[in-house]
Amino acid sequence: MTEYLLLLIGTVLVNNFVLVKFLGLCPFMGVSKKLESAIGMGLATTFVLTLASVCSYLVETYILSPLGIEYLRTMSFILVIAVVVQFTEMVVHKTSPTLYRVLGIFLPLITTNCAVLGVALLNVTENHNFVESIIYGFGAAVGFSLVLILFSAMRERIAAADVPLPFKGASIAMITAGLMSLAFMGFTGLVKL
């Protein structure tokens, strides 16, 4: 039980996919201008990452490995992720049309979010079992959502601040992301995996 908790904390804080592994930077920079859209994207990504992590584990364990076709791993994981994203898009469209409009193009772009594929591939390379795959996928999603929401809140405050003209826009956003990354480095000694 302790190793599962350490895996979760390690994935959320110590080995954060955005700030440490640099995966998922496109939605991190693209959706983080408004807090509302960042929360929606975080929830959608949490659902997709967790479900895709489970599905990719099942595909790897029960289809690819027994048939000896591990060389199709990346292509099959992309297919699994695309199916999960389409399912998520249908659910969001039916349950919250306003969130569906706010997320716009970024919801289908979860398919190409490298963090989702990265979690699926890292689950296989790190030999996680079924429960560890769920925890790893959920932890990566929570870490992504946490960083996205924090960054979005900071960007809203920075937008209202008096920022020098050369630093407005992407420049100050990159500086802020770098400072967040430094802050998350403080968690480095927290969990040894």
UniProtKB/Swiss-Prot annotation:
Chain ranges passing through the membrane: 5-25, 39-59, 67-87, 102-122, 134-154, 171-191
GO BP terms: electron transport chain
GO cellular component, one term: plasma membrane
Compartments (UniProt record): Cell inner membrane
Alphabetized UniProt keyword annotations: Cell inner membrane, Cell membrane, Electron transport, Membrane, Translocase, Transmembrane, Transmembrane helix, Transport
Main location: membrane
Documented EC number(s): 7.-.-.-
InterPro entries documented for this protein: Ion_transpt_RnfA/RsxA (IPR011293), NqrDE/RnfAE (IPR003667), NqrDE/RnfAE_oxidrdctase (IPR050133)
PANTHER family to which the protein is assigned, alphabetical: INTEGRAL MEMBRANE PROTEIN OF SOXR-REDUCING COMPLEX, ION-TRANSLOCATING OXIDOREDUCTASE COMPLEX SUBUNIT A
NCBIfam families, per the entry: PRK05151.1, rnfA
Function noted in UniProt: Part of a membrane-bound complex that couples electron transfer with translocation of ions across the membrane.
Record protein name field: Ion-translocating oxidoreductase complex subunit A
Naturally occurring in which organism (per UniProt): Aliivibrio fischeri (strain ATCC 700601 / ES114) (Vibrio fischeri)
